[in-house]
Amino acid sequence: MCIRDSYTHSLGTAAIVWHFTHDLKQSVAGLLHDIATPAFAHVVDFLNGDHMRQESTESRTRMMIASSPELMALLDKSGLTLDDVDDYHRYPIADNDSPRLSADRLEYTLGNAHLVFHCPKAELKRIFDDIFVGKNEENVDELCFAHADIADIFTQLSLRQSEWFVSDEDRFSMQALADLLREARQRNVLTVDDLYLDEPHVIALLLSDPVLAARWQDYRRITGTQSGAQKPEGTYAVKIAAKKRSIDPLVQTSDGLRRFTTVNADYASKLAAFRADDFDRWVWAKYE
């Protein structure tokens, strides 16, 4: 399977923002929005106790842009300032609050649909070509669908992704790795700044310590998870929730733009069921 990384995601987000706005500062803000993503990405949010919002690493965005002479020179050459591009949250086409649709959510949803769920590129193009910029309930720009049948295809892919993002396997693996990184910090094997290099660097540090190396190799042997109401004795287990990412896009109807859940009862029911999971169960590793 091809690997998606923050760089690819950022390029795609910027391209989508440019496609719908032709605004340079919005597009560059989209390009740079993940510049502060650390090694293992959202695992560090779990390490920071920010597993419900998953925004803890964004605080370094402005500093990382400002500390790059090359980026600052390019911004100046383009007539842009640091304030123009250091926070993509201010541009609703680039980013907005869930369950709205933005370039950020659109990019990773379509990317995962293709690389993880093997959705054909032609289908992704049908989805993308159906999207336009409209005004939402608060009269703010938002990406919308022109046709309900295309919105239906997109939302089924989106919901499948949402379930994957908070699956027992995902939550457990994120928390287990976060706990391993926490132990590495406690043993003075790595620092916070080490996390802002890359995964091979962090892994090399883990392998440099016999205790952590054994834990890392054990982590790599995990093939799945088991779950139950009771915590098994003598077994590492977690009971943890996570940020539920979901999309309920606007779709054009004869009555104007409406949220898809108001025009499609099946999706409304499935989305409600997804949101109802309280993660009230213990999860532990399964090995071959």
Question: What do the PLM-derived regions correspond to, one by one?
Answer:
Residues M1-K25, A39, V43, N48-E288:
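Histidine-centered, transition-metal-coordinating active-site segments
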